Design a protein with these regions (language model features):
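Short functional hotspots at interaction and active-site rims
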Residues: 1-213
Length: 213
């Protein structure tokens, strides 16, 4: 009985402590996968706004980076069609061109394309090369994809910081914060024409040439 009373006393002490600091005893809520923590989201947005301000003042360079691809299967956008009209995009799943690109709010772009699989090694090599040619501190905004958080990137981040290259990770499941997502939608929905998907040669040529404009 004495042991039970001692345990009960401990529970009351714990309750008293939490009540004293303003805590409430309530059921812990479940959060569906794919929804970022509100606290983390707010913190990251605040930090990103600070970086945006510094970039506008010319104190840093701020890029938003992401991967995408074009393929001969084609991209099917929305469009007006007359009744009985057969509007289509030529489609064949033969070739794919992967893209890693970075863009800032002044539309300065850096990136590369490859017909091979987009790997962490390729991204690391690209970022490492950039780190040698910086004129000011440069921040690259990334999502949390595994290729952005691999071991090699973790090992090189301290070295890149010394060269003036910094990585900023968005909160999970927040593509709306990455303006590179807009770039891909424009690429596939406006810049690429239906005839650009007919052959792999035309697809690759058009995609690469668009980045040179």
């Amino acid at each position: 009985m004495g042991a039970i009373l001692r345990q009960s006393g401990k529970r009351r002490n714990v309750q008293t402590f939490f009540i004293s600091i303003g805590a409430r005893y309530k059921r812990i809520r479940k959060r569906p996968r794919g929804v970022p923590s509100p606290q983390l989201y707010e913190y990251k947005v605040e930090k990103l706004q600070e970086l945006e301000k510094q970039a506008c003042e010319g104190r840093i360079r701020l890029y938003y980076a992401d991967e995408s691809h074009t393929c001969t299967e084609g991209y099917a956008p929305y469009g007006w069609q007359l009744r009985g009209e057969d509007v289509y995009i030529p489609s064949q799943r033969v070739a794919r061109l992967n893209i890693f690109g970075m863009i800032d709010r002044d539309n300065r772009y850096k990136g590369f394309t490859t017909s091979e699989k987009m790997t962490a090694d390729k991204i690391v090599s690209f970022l490492d090369e950039i780190s040698f040619n910086l004129k000011m501190d440069t921040f690259v905004v990334l999502d949390n994809a595994s290729v952005h958080r691999n071991k090699k990137i973790r090992e090189l981040r301290p070295i890149w910081k010394q060269r003036g290259l910094f990585l900023f990770y968005l909160p999970p499941y927040s593509p709306q914060l990455n303006i590179a997502e807009i770039l891909w939608r424009i690429l596939k929905g406006k810049w690429m024409r239906p005839q650009d998907y007919i052959t792999s040669d035309m697809l690759f040529y058009t995609t690469i040439e668009l980045w040179r404009i």
